[in-house]
Every structure is written in C-alpha cells, then in structure tokens.
C-alpha cells in the first residue's frame, strides 16, 4: 500500500496531451513502457559509461547502467511504500540525453555550444521525450506524465538562477514548478544513480586493470571489506572479490539511505507529497557519515580512474571526434541527413547549432566514430 506522501498514479497531474487511460497498466507503468520503446533508449546500449563500446564486451554502457539504477530505485521505493513504478521510470530515463563518449562527449559538445546557450544532458533528456522522439501522429515526443517529466528535470534538486533554454521553453507550457524539490521517487532515482555508478565504476576499473586492490587501500572503508573477505575466503579470485566488495558496498549504502530517509520523514511528520516538494532540503538522503564516504569514493574515482592515462587518452580522441563533427556540419549543413537539415530555422541564429547538437548528441559511440572517419579522415578509402 502506498504511503500518503507517495506519488499515486491514480492522482497524477496528467499529460500535456490528454489520453484515455488503459485498464491493464497504471500511468507510470505506461510511461516506463514508452521510454523503453524509444529509439533513444535503445541507443544507450552503444553509449559510453566509462569505457567506450569496443573496449570490451563486459564493461557497463549507458543502457546496462540505466537498468541497474532502475532496479536499485525500485527496491528502495518499494521499501519506503513509495511508487516503485515512478522511481523505476525516472531512473530508466535519467541518461537518455547523454552524448556519445560519456562525460567527455558532453564537455566537448557543451564547449562547441558555448555561444549558443550550451549543452546539458539533463535538458536533452527532456527534449528527447517531449520533442525529438517522433512515434505518435497526434504530437511530438512521447507525452509522459507530469510526475515523470518533473522527476527527470529536477531529480538533482530545484532549478534556480539561469535556466536551460529548452527547459524554460517547455516549462512555459507545462509548469514543472522548477523552484521546488521533486517527488521522493525522483530523489530516490538520483541517489540510486550515485549508488550504482560509484559501485560499478570501481568494479569495471578493477576488471580493466586501471586500478588494483592495492589502490583500494586508499579507501579504508572499502579496504576493510577486502580484508574481511580475504580472511574468510582464502582462495577467493579477484573477479569474485571485487563483486563481493561491490555487493557489500551497495547493501550498506541502500540500508543507510533507507534509515536516514525514514528518520527525515518521521522528523518532518510528512503526510502529503506537497510537503516533500516544499521542504528546504531533500527528504531522501544518506547519513552525514555515509555522504562523506561517498565523497571520498567519488574523489578516488576521479583521480585514479577518470583522470588515468588510459581514460584521458580515450577522452582526447573522443573530444576530437565530437568537435570535428560539429565543425564540419556547421561549415556545410548539406552533410546532415535531410530530415535534420530541413528543421533548421534560418530566422533563428542559434537554430543551426542547436539542430547539429541534437543530431550529434543522439549518436552512438560507434556511429560517431564511423561518421568522423567518413567526413574528417584523409583516408580516401573511407569515402
């Protein structure tokens, strides 16, 4: 049974374009299915998490990461008597707007767009779901519920100050109440993302031999798990050891989040979802001690993994590809597919750059590499 402060699909604020409900799915389940059926969701399979797609078959990509985040979010929401369908749906959609080549690709595209209001993967997720996906005759986008769109846009908290151009444009026709917190389910999706990526980036980095168990000694909290497991299982393999370490880490993070969130709900005497939205802090959180540990792990990953020679070398190549593609398309829009080129508004000075950014952002890693080799390589065998 849902808590009184949960997002109830029967009380949804609805969709921008009104539709008749179905008898066999609630509104959030319907949204989940629509997201899974998008082209953007399928393309996540060939988009970078940490390692680009051809680095290996067993490393995580944006699709496997999104699926893992959704299972964590669903479990947490279930335990708290919140809408697991909403938490799962927001989690599945949270990375739809990512460029090829992960954060290196996003940084590069944002740099290309600096004179055209920049690029944000969060805003791009909204744009995909409300404009770029073209699956229905009656409207652009996939016409999701207000609660799902709110959760995607505000899952990291209220938006104040300078608002992204597309978010502001969409918000003018469907007010997402940008200055308030999102639902508890959206907050869960955001922290499920943290739990998943710090745990699994450690696992993949060990598997890729970017770091080893000696490096993990820098994280006393993690190193203690390694010591205990080695003591208990004398002949444990490295692959099994890191899996068990990650398993313990995820369990402890989830348990901590559940305890702190229940404490916050009881302290604030929460009885309605609007009380969650209007608080001056997010209701779903870790304890202070665990937040500090998470910061340590993120710092470790940043310094030991994301800034490693191997990842840096890959990132430089990815930057060259994204910037190279942007440059050639800006110089000659006839290189774009016709269905993209015709969208350019000659009366809007930012239109050409924005259409090109949308096109590049939708590329998979391998298509971006293929397109770069076709358009930017001096090897005439590629022509």
Curated annotation (Swiss-Prot):
GO terms for molecular function: dGTPase activity. CDD domains: HDc. Disulfide bonds: none annotated. Keywords: Hydrolase. GO terms for biological process: dGTP catabolic process. It comes from the Bacteria. Signal peptide: none annotated. SUPFAM superfamilies: HD-domain/PDEase-like. InterPro entries: dGTPase, dGTPase-like, dNTPase_2, HD/PDEase_dom, HD_domain, PHydrolase_assoc_dom. Pfam families: HD, HD_assoc. Residues 62-198 form the HD domain. Belongs to the dGTPase family. Type 2 subfamily. This is Deoxyguanosinetriphosphate triphosphohydrolase-like protein. It comes from Rickettsia bellii (strain RML369-C).
């Amino acid at each position: 049974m849902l808590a009184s402060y949960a997002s109830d699909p029967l009380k949804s604020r609805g969709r921008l374009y009104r539709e008749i409900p179905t008898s066999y799915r609630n509104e959030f389940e319907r949204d989940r299915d629509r997201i899974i059926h998008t082209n953007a969701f399928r393309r996540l399979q060939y988009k970078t998490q940490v390692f680009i797609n051809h680095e290996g078959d067993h490393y995580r990509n944006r699709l496997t990461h999104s699926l893992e985040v959704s299972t964590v979010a669903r479990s947490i929401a279930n335990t708290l008597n919140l809408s697991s369908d909403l938490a799962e749906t927001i989690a599945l959609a949270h990375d739809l707007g990512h460029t090829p080549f992960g954060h290196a690709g996003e940084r590069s595209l944002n740099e290309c767009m600096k004179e055209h209001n920049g690029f944000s993967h969060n805003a791009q997720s909204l744009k995909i779901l409300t404009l770029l996906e073209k699956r229905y005759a009656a409207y652009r986008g996939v016409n999701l519920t207000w609660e799902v769109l709110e959760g995607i846009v505000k899952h990291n908290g209220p938006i104040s100050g300078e608002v992204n151009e597309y978010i502001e444009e969409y918000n003018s026709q469907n007010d997402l109440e940008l200055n308030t917190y999102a639902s508890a389910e959206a907050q869960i999706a955001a922290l499920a993302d943290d739990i998943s990526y710090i745990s699994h980036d450690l696992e993949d980095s060990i598997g890729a031999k970017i770091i080893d168990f000696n490096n993990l000694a820098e994280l006393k909290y993690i190193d203690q798990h390694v010591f205990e497991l080695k003591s208990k299982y004398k002949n444990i393999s490295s692959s099994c050891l890191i899996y068990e370490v990650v398993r313990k880490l995820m369990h402890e993070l989830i348990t901590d989040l559940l305890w702190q969130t229940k404490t916050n709900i009881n302290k604030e005497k929460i009885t309605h979802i609007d009380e969650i939205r209007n608080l001056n802090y997010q209701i779903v959180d870790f304890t202070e001690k665990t937040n500090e540990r998470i910061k340590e792990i993120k710092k470790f990953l940043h310094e030991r993994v994301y800034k490693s020679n191997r990842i840096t070398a890959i990132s430089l190549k990815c930057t060259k590809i994204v910037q190279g593609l942007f440059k050639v398309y800006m110089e000659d829009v006839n290189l774009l597919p016709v269905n993209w080129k015709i969208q350019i508004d000659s009366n809007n000075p930012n239109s050409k750059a924005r259409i090109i950014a949308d096109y590049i952002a939708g590329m998979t890693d391998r298509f971006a590499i293929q397109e770069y080799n076709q358009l930017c390589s001096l090897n005439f065998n590629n022509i």
